[in-house]
From Swiss-Prot:
Residues 478-492 have a biased composition (Basic and acidic residues). Residues 418-433 have a biased composition (Low complexity). Disulfide bonds: none annotated. This is Protein HIRA. It comes from the Eukaryota.
Length: 975
């Protein structure tokens, strides 16, 4: 045996928490307290190494974690390296072509190899301390200090299951080499065996660790390569610490490895089995499978295969045992000054690497005469096959019906199609141009956008989230038919199609960007004047139904503040919106102008946009009759032009703060609290409307509705066609804060946006990025976006590629949350994720956004299916299925037209959503397949009943027979 302790294997003098040798035997990796992963060459520590090139020792340094690296584990194929850290993140690394880079300022040479992160797994809410790959490398298990074990699919990086059963920190996890179970060990002094078929708890073992003392960094248990033994850590049998061994099936401790003077931290089985003498494969078949320990009395003991295991302890020693002997084969003392925390065997089975908290690594190279002769892989596979059967291709679950398999196929195609569609949208965004010409130049010639279908009307003042308008999701669905044992048919959808990226781009090219959504720093030009902004819209004509509207407001501040009026301001307790931020100087404000553009798509393509401009002008005393001295007045000139042609103009004796307009009217809000409405030709449609305070936000829809928010926090919505006030409300309900509820002084609340949502209801966004939608039916504000779910897995994953309002609001929330303190590590992310999805589902329904509603619904159903939450899944399915019904016949057909249940939601058929989206998403977890089959049967019966009712409705009724008297008269006349 050769032992070595290379001094050059280090992590800047800090602890080394994990070590693992690549299955190919070319590299080994270490993770340490310096937040780095280092990949080393095995040639430099090989026992037959004669010429060591120091420049080739360290192959790469990975610096992508932001916390201590607790665990590194190679996949069995050696391509991927998984790492877990204190930053609660798991990363999957892969080698890429070329050489690596060096850390700036470190003075280190560039890496020899180039390793990059190919997948980041987020979901844990505390430190990730142990990892283990499945036998086929398709799944990764992770144990964390959040008391859970997460199961990750390597096909897509999604967490497929969260195992909750431990009441304390999970510090070790290991995978059954057969693939049927997972074992985890926790500080609650229990070991839990989990089934991989449905991720249920198979057995909880306790009692063997109840007398254990102290605490350890890890409890890294291990499964034997034969699949029969689990060696655990941190056991105690007076007067020694032990490593209890559990036997498969009964899951009870049959014997212990005794001898350490401190708690056992890590155990590691050799990858293969050994025998004392060389033998042929025929001897291996005849011999028992070698599950017995040293007390075995088998007659063929000399040829019986046995396991080799290494144990590391807090007593700074390492012991190596075989299951063919009751005494340790090897004891390593005085190699480390602190606890041993991780072990790794080489692929050939004759080298052992160990790392310690003292920041050092030791290597032990054994001879065949010491450990025995290693079984070939084919022999080991034959041993497992004789005991467990053929484990190749063994499925984790068993489908109970052909429908389950067909729905799983539909779900897989659905997920793949959605993923490809998202990637295409991300890689090929639609081209959108924003026209912001310099005010010193003339308005450029611009082509009017092409006429869009009537169902795709947009306002020219639409925000940036309108650019990527989601295309229609529905498409022809291929179906598969089969017959059940009772002879009835069942229709199974194959997949749900998604539109191509080309369609989305074509529909998005003609949509403009609302200049009011641009950053305030972009609004003022370099010379201090306000540039003109053009927003392309879809003004069809001057009728009542098809309009386009845009808005503008002056750049007084970056945001507006709502706060309670001071005591000196009056006792009415009214709200006031005050200007905050950088106020434009008077000289600058006096020369700045505000302008908007409106296009008319009814005109030819070369027509120029209509421009409305409000420009401050000053009149001196010499220009006014009857006034002397240096007195001057400030006015605002309103000019409407098309190119160089002036359509109309007017003057207002006040400073203009906001502008809005469409093909029907123009609206001008002033600082003195008046609102002037003009017709499209420039006539004053009505006397000036006095609001009592300056207008700070204004917006209009495609028809005749106008929204206005004043500085005092009052909101008005008028229908200018009928000259009625549709809504008059205050933003007072948005001001209430926790400090006010506690009786403290109320802080201010900044409003950054107030406009019409796409559904036509007013939408207000605060500086905290909380968004509120006014529900005219409930007559109250609905909070549709907030930061109440920081631990949700979907807190920042809703993208705006679908062009939805809710997606954009969610992204703003995510950016705002990034600046806030992190949440508690003990937060239950599962509960928050479910609550967040339910909130998003209700918010998309309130916004009347069918695309986002369907997206949230799919995510919610997949989450419930992953958690096997049958009660909520049943409730959702029942709401989409309709009212309960028994055997459908003509007498009960009236139930299908029950007015209390709407068969549609946001223009989508509920039964179609149930058949094409909900049921295929439920098929991802076979644990709920019985519930799935139940609703498939019910849906088939409902659709059959609906078909019968429709056929009855279209059956023509026979004409009534002629009256008897008329018939007799005709007969007499004929005679």
């Amino acid at each position: 045996m050769i032992t070595e302790k290379p001094s050059w294997i280090r992590h800047e003098g800090l602890q080394i928490f994990s070590i693992d040798i690549q299955p190919g035997g070319i590299r080994f990796a270490t993770g340490g307290g310096d937040q780095k992963i280092r990949i080393w060459s095995m040639k430099s520590v090989a026992k037959d190494n004669d010429s060591d090139d120091s420049s080739q020792r360290l192959l790469a340094t990975i610096r992508d974690h932001f916390g201590t690296v607790n665990c590194v584990r190679w996949a069995h194929h050696g391509r991927y390296l998984a790492s877990g850290s204190d930053d609660q993140v798991i990363q999957i690394h892969e080698r890429k072509a070329g050489t690596g880079t060096s850390e700036f300022g470190s003075g280190e040479p560039p890496d020899v190899e180039n390793w990059k992160v190919v997948m980041t797994l987020r979901g844990h809410t505390a430190d990730v301390v142990d990892l283990n790959w499945s036998p086929d490398d398709s799944t990764l298990a992770s144990g964390s200090l959040d008391n859970t074990v997460h199961i990750w699919s390597m096909a897509n990086g999604i967490c497929t299951a969260v195992l909750r059963g431990h009441s304390s920190l999970v510090k070790g996890v290991t995978w059954d080499p057969i693939g049927s179970f997972i074992a985890s060990q926790s500080d609650d002094k229990t070991v839990i065996i989990w089934r991989t078929s449905d991720w249920s708890l198979a057995h909880r073992t306790e009692g063997h660790w109840s007398k254990s003392l102290g605490s350890t960094f890890f409890r890294r248990l291990a499964w034997s390569p034969c699949g029969h033994f689990i060696t655990t850590t941190h056991g105690f049998q007076k007067p020694r610490h032990s490593a209890p061994v559990l036997e498969r099936g009964e899951w009870s401790a049959t014997f212990d490895f005794l001898g350490h003077n401190a708690p056992v931290v890590v155990v590691k089985f050799n990858h293969s089995m050994f025998r004392k003498h060389l033998s042929s494969g025929q001897d291996a078949k005849a011999a028992p499978a070698g599950w017995a320990n040293g007390a075995s009395k088998a007659s063929s003991k000399e040829h019986q295969p046995y396991n080799v295991i290494a144990i590391g302890s807090q007593d700074r020693t390492i012991t190596v045992w075989t299951t063919a002997s009751a005494r340790p084969l090897f004891v390593a003392k005085h190699f480390f000054t602190q606890s041993v925390v991780d072990l790794s065997w080489s692929p050939d089975g004759y080298s052992l690497f160990a790392c310690s908290l003292d920041g050092s690594v030791a290597t032990f190279h054994f001879e065949a005469k010491e450990l025995g002769y290693r079984l070939r892989d084919a022999e080991l596979d034959e041993l497992k096959k004789n005991r467990y059967g053929d484990v190749r291709g063994r499925q984790s679950n068993i489908a109970e019906s052909p429908a389950q398999l067909l729905l799983e196929e539909a779900s897989a195609k659905q997920s793949a199609s959605k993923k490809v569609s998202s990637v295409q949208q991300f890689q090929s965004p639609p081209k959108v141009s924003t026209d912001a010409p310099n005010p010193s130049t003339s308005v450029p010639n611009q082509k009017a956008p092409e006429a869009l279908p009537e169902d795709e009307k947009k306002t020219a003042g639409s925000t940036a989230d309108d650019i990527n308008k989601a295309p229609r999701l529905s498409s022809p669905v291929k179906q598969r038919e089969y017959r059940r044992p009772d002879g009835r048919k069942r229709i199974i959808p194959e997949a749900v199609g998604f539109p191509s990226n080309q369609d989305m781009s074509n529909r998005s090219q003609n949509q403009g960007v609302d200049f009011s959504s641009l950053d305030q720093r972009m609004i003022l030009g370099e010379n201090g004047t306000r540039p003109s902004y053009s927003a392309s819209g879809n003004c069809n004509n001057c009728g009542v139904r098809e309009r386009s509207g845009i808005t503008a407001r002056t750049n007084i501040s970056e945001s507006l503040v709502i706060q309670k009026a001071s005591a000196g301001a009056g006792s009415d307790g009214r709200l006031s919106i005050e200007q905050s931020g950088s106020v434009v100087p008077g000289s600058l404000a006096s020369c700045s102008s505000l302008s908007i553009h409106v296009f008319n798509k009814k005109d030819n393509e070369d027509s120029l946009p209509v421009r409305l401009e409000a420009k401050p002008v000053e009149r001196s005393a010499g220009d006014m009759i009857g006034l002397g001295g240096a007195f001057s007045t400030k006015e605002t000139e309103i000019t409407c032009t098309r190119g160089t042609e002036t359509l109309w103009s007017d003057r207002i004796s006040a400073k203009v703060t906001v502008l809005a307009g469409n093909a029907n009217f123009w609206a001008v809000g002033c600082e003195d609290g008046c609102l002037q409405v003009y017709t499209k030709c420039g006539r004053r449609a009505m006397p000036a409307m006095m609001m009592g305070s300056a207008a700070v936000f204004i917006d209009c829809d495609e028809c005749w509705k106008l929204l206005l928010v004043t500085r005092r926090g009052l909101m008005y919505i008028w229908d200018l066609y009928t000259r009625t006030c549709v809504l008059h409300d205050s933003l007072a309900s948005l001001v209430t804060s926790p400090d006010e509820a506690a009786g403290k002084d109320t802080g201010t609340v900044k409003v950054i946006s107030a406009k019409f949502s796409r559904c036509g209801s007013p939408l207000v966004v605060l500086a905290s990025r909380h968004a509120f939608l006014y529900d005219t039916s409930l007559k109250c504000w609905l909070r549709i976006a907030d930061d109440c779910f920081p631990a949700s897995n979907f807190a920042s994953s809703f993208s705006s590629t679908q062009g939805g309002e809710l997606g954009k609001l969610q992204i703003d929330i995510g950016k705002f949350m990034a600046r806030k303190p992190i949440w508690s590590r003990v937060t239950d992310d599962g509960v928050q994720t479910r609550s967040h999805l339910e909130t998003q589902l209700a918010a998309s329904l309130a916004l009347k956004s069918p695309q986002e509603y369907r997206q949230c619904l799919l995510s919610y159903i997949r989450f419930l299916a992953r958690e096997a939450d049958e009660s909520r899944l049943r409730e959702v399915c029942e709401s989409f299925l309709g009212p309960p019904m028994g055997m459908v016949d003509a007498a009960s057909s009236a139930d299908l037209k029950n007015p209390s249940w709407d068969p549609d939601v946001l223009g989508m058929k509920k039964h179609k959503l149930l058949r094409e989206d909900i049921l295929p998403s439920m098929a991802t977890n076979r644990k709920v397949q019985r519930l799935l089959n139940e609703f498939m049967d019910l849906l088939s019966e409902y659709e059959a009943a609906e078909t019968n009712v429709e056929q009855m409705d279209v059956t023509p009724t026979p004409p009534p027979p002629p009256p008897a008297a008329a018939t007799e008269g005709n007969n007499n006349g004929a005679s």
